[in-house]
């Protein structure tokens, strides 16, 4: 017999995975959505809907140097894989310079940041495992537009916290 004072059990949601494989063309998004974030294009390649929330993968094309603030995810691991350009990635106390073909891994709860440090266009794959609410995070971030630049500390801190992340410090300096 169930205790009437006990908390309700969490409902388990089972989503249908894609029944077949799929192709996402170069420079295209899985759902043809355009996410522009701080001058870069973010294309979703594998969605949380494709993997029952197990992971999501983004292809980010950046046109200017820089990257996000030092932060940590409470529930997601993050993997970085460089396709074009040179990137600096900090994970905990280690800093790595990544070139095309190099990758770095940031376990959940470990502070990390990345920045494009080369001239011209750069391209990096970002994988989040599990997906969590990263897709919603990037959609909201892209909608913020100028608000990011007008009051970045307040706007980004709130957005990060709403999606299980914490801003720890400033973006990487190089």
Identify the role of each PLM range.
Residues 54, 60, 70-73, 77-82, ...:
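His/acidic/aromatic-lined binding-pocket segments of jelly-roll/cupin-type domains
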